[in-house]
Amino acid sequence: MAAILLACGDTSQSTFDRIQALEKEAFVGDSLRADVRRQLMVSYADLAREQPEHPFVPEGLFRRADLLISAGKYEQAVLQLQDLHDGYPAYELRPRCAFLVAFIHDVHLRDPELARRAYERVIALHEGTPEAEMSAQSLRWLPQRP
């Protein structure tokens, strides 16, 4: 039985090890390697699925959302950020997740109505945070954007 367990290994730890190795080779100078970006997006999701209680999961999902944005996958990034915001209530970057949802709707997807609702949600849920202040500022500028 021990041989079977050793052969199978701890997949969540090996996934975390893979993430750490990939992060070390992700950049060539200032440029993110596209092949590593794809592998990291998959690995962050794998870790969350394999071991949702792992302490790195919220940060990994946040990094995955960032990679989705850099890949131009804005709708997927919005879903990832919403899931992270709603699924990890103790995550310290929740206000930033909510703000980024609004920002993506505003700047990348150019949907002023969804952006407005998302900015208002940040203000309501995260009062007193820098993200709430940025949301209020963004709302003031929203009607003036082309």
What does each of the following model-derived ranges do?
Residues I4-P146:
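Acidic, polar-rich low-complexity tracts and alpha-helical solenoid repeat scaffolds
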